[in-house]
């Protein structure tokens, strides 16, 4: 009986940790690009349901524990971008285009190869620049609202030391308690506790497509889908990368009119469902990801109450909880950005330009960071006669699968050593290129979804 319940319990934990660790980032991001409280609640509901549908479909179809989540780094990108010209409808249009690009990457391997061609230091530096503003929020909160922020940060520190996966959820519980003790009950008087779908007709303009849709696609691919695949490969699975991109991209497109910004493979929380803690038998772990998807969809029903809570709290306190959730991703992104000595200056330029938050020609800093770092890298490599960075010494892992598959993946923590610390977000890992490229490949040995012999 315990063996049957083990993957179900692992799935419940995966859903709870994933939701509680980063829903504040999602709400902050949606509100930053112009969503009202009702539209932000609708967006959170949309990404929960879309993630759940994708996880259930992929788990049942392929019998692989492919956990799906919203793009936490993508939500941080929304915070860094702020309101785009044209407001919320244009942001919704950017979400839709980003989802369509993910579908295209699953259908056309060349697009996936183009994303994988972005040097890892540049991708990591861009992600670090996107995350930095939110990661400084805990410091600002300690200065601006110390009575509320000090207990939250202390709870995070203690739990991070003794129970890392519960550090951010625990900090959130303390924040909720602090808000409840300092906010009159009448503050919830007009709040809508159950979310309602708020559909928005998408609109488009060039600056939002370049400044939001394209960076959102790149961040989601490099910081979520690639590490998520690497986790599965590290646990011995041969996941169908193309199928995962098509499923998550399609659900992103469907969720966009309701305010959903991006759905993708989970990265850190993927280890909760794919590792031996989910079940000793790898063939049974897919039950954990299906349970997690179902649980996340149900947790979406609390989007209205979560939004009402965020609206009552001092904005800097909510940003502080979000920043604590992203510290692990920031550390990983910085490690990736500075891993190659020959590329460090270009990575630093990318980081500085992205973190500056500058807007030029209506396009945000993430795009210009990529451009600045890419140009500098190109000039330095051309002057020196080509790349001088040392090759990675890690042994690549090949993962054949039907249709679009994955190229050799290099990751710093490929197996059970993955520590589920925060949410489904993680920066690029390892060295070299971004690391996962869709391509055509034959079916590997064994049944579909059964881990290959290591």
What are these regions (language model features)?
Residues 1-42, 169-241:
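Helix-loop-helix hairpins and the membrane-proximal interhelical loops
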Residues 5-8, 151, 210, 246-250, ...:
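Alpha-helical membrane-protein architecture signal
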Residues 29, 78, 114, 135-139, ...:
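Hydrophobic alpha-helical interface/terminus motif in multipass membrane transporters
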Residues 85-186, 291-386:
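Membrane-embedded alpha-helical modules
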Residues 387-396, 401-404, 408, 413-416, ...:
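Intrinsically disordered, low-complexity proline-rich tandem-repeat tracts
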Residues 7-25, 45-123, 239-327:
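Helix-loop-helix junctions within the multi-pass membrane cores of secondary transporters/permeases
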Residues 374-390, 442, 449-454:
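Terminal cytosolic tails of multi-pass membrane transporters
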């Amino acid at each position: 009986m315990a063996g049957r319940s083990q993957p179900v319990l692992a799935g419940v934990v995966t859903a709870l940790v994933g939701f509680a660790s980063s829903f504040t980032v999602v709400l902050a991001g949606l509100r930053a690009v112009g969503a009202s409280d009702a539209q932000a609640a609708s967006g959170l509901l949309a990404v929960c349901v879309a993630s759940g549908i994708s996880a259930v479909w992929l788990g049942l179809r392929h019998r692989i524990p492919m956990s799906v989540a919203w793009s936490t780094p993508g939500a941080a990108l929304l915070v860094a971008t702020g309101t785009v010209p044209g407001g919320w409808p244009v942001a919704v249009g950017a979400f839709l285009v980003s989802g369509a690009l993910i579908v295209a990457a699953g259908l056309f391997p060349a697009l996936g190869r183009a994303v994988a061609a972005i040097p890892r230091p540049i991708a990591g530096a861009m992600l670090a620049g996107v995350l930095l503003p939110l990661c400084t929020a805990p410091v600002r909160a300690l200065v601006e609202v110390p009575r509320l922020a000090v207990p939250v940060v202390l709870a995070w520190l203690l739990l991070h030391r003794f129970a890392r996966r519960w550090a951010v959820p625990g900090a959130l519980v303390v924040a909720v308690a602090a808000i409840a003790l300092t906010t009159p009950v009448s503050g919830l008087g007009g709040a809508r506790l159950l979310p309602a779908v708020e559909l928005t007709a998408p609109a488009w303009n060039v600056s939002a497509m370049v400044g939001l849709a394209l960076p959102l696609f790149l961040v989601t691919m490099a910081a979520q889908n690639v590490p998520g695949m690497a986790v599965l490969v590290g646990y011995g699975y041969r996941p169908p990368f193309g199928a995962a991109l098509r499923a998550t991209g399609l659900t992103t497109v469907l969720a966009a009119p309701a305010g959903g910004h991006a759905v993708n493979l989970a990265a850190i929380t993927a280890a909760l469902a794919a590792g031996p803690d989910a079940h000793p038998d790898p063939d049974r772990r897919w039950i954990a990801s299906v349970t997690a998807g179902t649980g996340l969809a149900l947790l979406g029903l609390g989007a209205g109450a979560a939004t009402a809570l965020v609206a009552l709290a001092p904005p800097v306190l909510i940003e502080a909880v979000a920043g604590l959730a992203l510290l692990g991703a920031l550390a990983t992104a910085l490690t990736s950005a500075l891993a190659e000595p020959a590329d460090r200056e270009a990575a630093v330029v990318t980081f500085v330009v992205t973190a500056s938050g500058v807007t030029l020609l209506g396009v945000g800093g993430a795009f210009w960071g990529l451009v600045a770092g890419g140009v500098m890298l190109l000039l330095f490599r051309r002057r020196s006669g080509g790349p001088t960075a040392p090759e990675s010494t890690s042994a690549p892992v090949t993962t054949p699968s039907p249709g679009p598959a994955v190229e050799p993946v290099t990751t710093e923590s490929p197996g059970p050593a993955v520590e589920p610390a925060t949410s489904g977000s993680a920066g690029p890992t390892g060295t070299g290129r971004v690391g996962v490229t869709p391509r055509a490949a034959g079916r590997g040995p064994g049944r579909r979804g059964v881990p290959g012999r290591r």
